[in-house]
């Protein structure tokens, strides 16, 4: 560019183009966290959320409740690490776990629907997976996570495979769950 003004104009054009291309992936341009954005959307819609977490071990609930005022939209949740608690607290049928395994799309859906119903929430999230470093198999490797989001119009489920260590997998699993809510409410 021949001048600072031309360079600035060109930079603004590129920023606009990037924003257009990445709009589905950018949730904030002012530094707000994903949990803040999700809380904002839930409040705008007068909606509530409950979670049933397995491999994330409460990280999702911790992230949501780290935001002041989250009690207006977050009803609570359960860390259902054992199969018995999946059945007892989130109403996952034991037969479903026996048939498909605890780490499955079917169990993620049952977790989301069960916790939504139990807490009488607008939305329920179910997360189950293999955070590692052990416990993986060729069919269900470390990093495999199923996320389900249940609402009054049905339930959607997403399968993801995350790399990295246990904490990284747990973080990305919680990020994916929050992003599912964000996209649903946009």
PLM features: residue spans?
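Short beta-strand-to-loop capping motifs
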Residues: 1-3
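Short alpha-helical segments enriched in small residues
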Residues: 6-186
């Amino acid at each position: 560019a021949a001048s600072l003004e031309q360079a600035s104009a060109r930079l603004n054009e590129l920023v606009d183009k990037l924003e257009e291309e990445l709009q589905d992936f950018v949730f904030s341009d002012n530094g707000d966290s994903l949990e803040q954005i999700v809380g904002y959307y839930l409040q705008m819609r007068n909606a509530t959320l409950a979670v049933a977490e397995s491999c994330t071990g409460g990280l999702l609930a911790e992230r949501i409740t780290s935001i002041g005022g989250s009690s207006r939209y977050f009803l609570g949740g359960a860390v259902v690490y054992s199969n018995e608690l999946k059945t007892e607290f989130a109403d996952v049928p034991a037969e479903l776990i026996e048939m498909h395994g605890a780490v499955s799309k079917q169990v993620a859906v049952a977790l989301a629907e069960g916790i939504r119903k139990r807490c009488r929430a607008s939305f329920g999230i179910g997360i189950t997976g293999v955070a590692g470093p052990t416990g993986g198999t060729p069919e269900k490797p470390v990093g495999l996570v199923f996320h389900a989001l249940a609402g009054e119009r049905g339930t959607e489920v997403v399968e993801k495979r995350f790399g990295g260590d246990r904490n990284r997998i747990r973080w990305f699993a919680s990020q994916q769950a929050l992003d599912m809510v964000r996209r649903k409410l946009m």
